[in-house]
Amino acid sequence: MTDLSPVLTIDGPSGAGKGTVSRIVAARLGWHYLDSGALYRAVGVAASWADLDVSDPAALVRCTFDTKVEFDEAGEAGLRVLVNGVDATGELRLETTGALASAIAAIPEVRSALKERQRAFRQPPGLVADGRDMGTVIFPDAAFKVFLTASAEERAGRRHKQLMEKGVSVIFDDLLREIMARDARDAQRVVAPLRPAEDAVLIDTSGIGIEDVVQRVVGLLDSRTP
């Protein structure tokens, strides 16, 4: 990597709060924001639209190369995502899309195909990269690395609240099982398993408000910036 723009990686399991924290921190710093999970979800959406078989790696790899993904950064409010020119933001956040993205992310060729696409987000004045392997694989030379975590029960509770507020009826125990299953898949995959980088700062977000986590992350940057 020749671009020496600073990078802050924020990794962690689903529901740990990394997306919200990353967006807020990026907006406050005036840095670019990479939601790596949205890339995998976008490929999942494109594969779903094309009615591809998730058990056909070759077809999914072709889909990865053929899918055009555009991010419309919207500050702290969120991210608008276009898949092949179509606004797919809502579909990207469906539970079914998340499960499909997790399965697709386990395919080594897909991860390889998306690696350089993710690294291209590293531009001045800096980048906040949110994902599961940002600090270990995509930006191992990042100057600032954070790993957010929380108990499975805490994360299921957060997701349950989000869905209920949107009018989506869901059973808590079902969400908990899905989160635990996804944790297992992410941790056990052969390529880029979910784990903290050795030099990452670990923050358990259980019972902590978003603003408190944001302040801790910003404080980390302030303490390490000359």
Curated annotation (Swiss-Prot):
It catalyses: CMP + ATP = CDP + ADP; dCMP + ATP = dCDP + ADP. Transmembrane segments: none annotated. Keywords: ATP-binding, Cytoplasm, Kinase, Nucleotide-binding, Transferase. It is found in: Cytoplasm. Belongs to the cytidylate kinase family. Type 1 subfamily. The keyword Transmembrane helix does not apply. One of its GO terms (molecular function) is CMP kinase activity. Coiled coil: none annotated. InterPro entries: Cytidylate_kin, Cytidylate_kinase_dom, P-loop_NTPase. HAMAP family: Cytidyl_kinase_type1. The keyword Transferase applies. ATP binds at residues 12-20. Disulfide bonds: none annotated. This is Cytidylate kinase. GO terms for cellular component: cytoplasm. Signal peptide: none annotated. One of its GO terms (biological process) is pyrimidine nucleotide metabolic process. Its EC number is 2.7.4.25. The gene is cmk. CDD domains: CMPK.
